[in-house]
From Swiss-Prot:
Domain Pyruvate carboxyltransferase as annotated: residue spans: 5-257
Organism annotation: Ralstonia nicotianae (strain ATCC BAA-1114 / GMI1000)
Residue numbers binding substrate: 13-14, 167, 196, 287
PROSITE patterns attached to this UniProt entry: PYR_CT
Example of a GO biological process term: L-leucine biosynthetic process
PANTHER family the UniProt entry points to: 2-ISOPROPYLMALATE SYNTHASE 1, CHLOROPLASTIC-RELATED, HOMOCITRATE SYNTHASE-RELATED
Gene name tied to this protein: dmpG
Protein name (Swiss-Prot/TrEMBL): 4-hydroxy-2-oxovalerate aldolase
Site residues by UniProt (Transition state stabilizer): 13
Gene3D superfamilies: 1.10.8.60, Aldolase class I (3.20.20.70)
Catalytic activity annotation: (S)-4-hydroxy-2-oxopentanoate = acetaldehyde + pyruvate
Catalytic residues identified in the record: 17
Length: 338
């Protein structure tokens, strides 16, 4: 492979789910400086649910997105600052403010069959001169061909990179291969592709490797896998595997290993790992950020979180339907034998 992989770190955005969006500014700066020193290409910064995600529904952040973004932008010298925007949560106004605070990349994220809602945000990002990425979440919930058609929409709005996003950590390796082949068949040769994997079936690194084999340009990963559910593809593990495969990248593996174990892992109040609950996410194809919400609701009502998660999968709930976690719990209580 003759290209250099683009490494997109998501520790400070997806990883925010693992700490209930409670990173302090000092912690964000410390992590960003370590990532910058290790030469990752970009660092995504926002509430776990993207710009303006801080809310009753998704969980309130310890700081505003702009406070985190501005602090990280000032702290880094090599990496570019990225952010995430979900239309319907974040607005064009939020995007402009994030750009003013220092974000130079935006990933505009929609459910995998709803790319049409991203047009306004993608067009605005391009007008601001931002590196503009389309982010198709829950990509396991549609066919490769339908996903490719949604990717085409984002490309037509101005996105220059389209991501296959395995939000539920439910894709197998052949699933990833089929989706990238479908995208490559329809997108312009100059349009890049990216992979955002979750580790709920322990396939985060394997799926990222398959994506690269199919021509993927950008790889999302996080230190110690810090992310929703069982986490993302662990950055240090992916880089070690890439190095063993002889793939080019700009990262310092040892620096990433140190940052993962010395800085990030100690912040986890709940281990980011494959266990009964996070495995249920991948098995049932449930949005990974539902985990902490489901665990809290289960504790409140005397239920098992895994039962709630499996039922959410049966009902095909998607990101943004966090309120349904309580509904499912109440329904499960009603079905209990007196």
């Amino acid at each position: 492979m003759d290209k250099t992989l683009y490494i997109s770190d998501v520790t400070l955005r997806d990883g925010s789910h693992a700490v209930r969006h409670q990173y302090t500014v000092a912690q964000a700066v410390q992590i960003a400086k370590a990532l910058d020193a290790a030469r990752v290409d970009s660092i995504e910064v926002a509430h776990g649910d993207g710009l303006a995600g801080s809310s009753f529904n998704y969980g309130f952040g310890a700081h505003t997105d702009l406070e985190w973004i501005a602090a990280v932008a000032e702290a880094v010298h090599h990496a570019r600052v990225a952010t995430l925007l979900l239309p319907g949560i974040g607005t064009v106004h939020d995007l402009r403010n994030a750009h003013a605070a220092g974000a130079r990349i935006v990933r505009v994220a929609t459910h995998c069959t709803e790319a049409d809602v991203s047009r306004q945000h993608i067009e605005t990002a391009r007008a601001l001169g931002m590196d503009t990425v389309g982010f198709l979440m829950m990509s396991h919930m549609t066919t490769p061909d339908r996903l490719a058609q949604e990717a085409l929409k984002m490309e037509s709005y101005g996105a220059t990179c389209i991501y296959v996003v395995d939000s539920g950590g439910a894709l197998g390796m052949n699933d990833v291969r089929e989706r990238f082949r479908a995208l490559k068949q329809v997108l312009k040769p100059e349009t890049q592709t990216g992979i955002h994997a979750h580790h709920n079936l322990s396939l985060g690194v394997a799926n990222s490797i398959v994506a690269v084999e199919e021509g993927c340009d950008r790889i999302d990963a996080s230190l110690a896998g810090m992310g929703a559910g069982a986490g993302n593809a662990p950055l240090e593990v992916f880089i070690a595997a890439a190095q063993r495969l002889g793939w080019r990248h700009s990262c310092d593996l040892m620096a990433l290993m140190d940052a993962a174990d010395d800085i990030v892992r100690p912040l986890q109040d709940r281990p980011v790992r494959v266990d009964r609950e996070t495995l249920a996410l991948g098995y049932a194809g449930v949005y990974s950020s539902f985990l902490r919400h489901a665990e809290a609701v289960a504790q409140r009502h005397g239920l098992k979180a895994v039962d709630i998660l499996i039922e959410l999968g049966h009902r095909r709930m998607v990101g943004g339907q966090e309120d349904m976690i309580v509904d499912v719990a109440l329904d499960l209580l009603q079905t209990r034998t007196p």
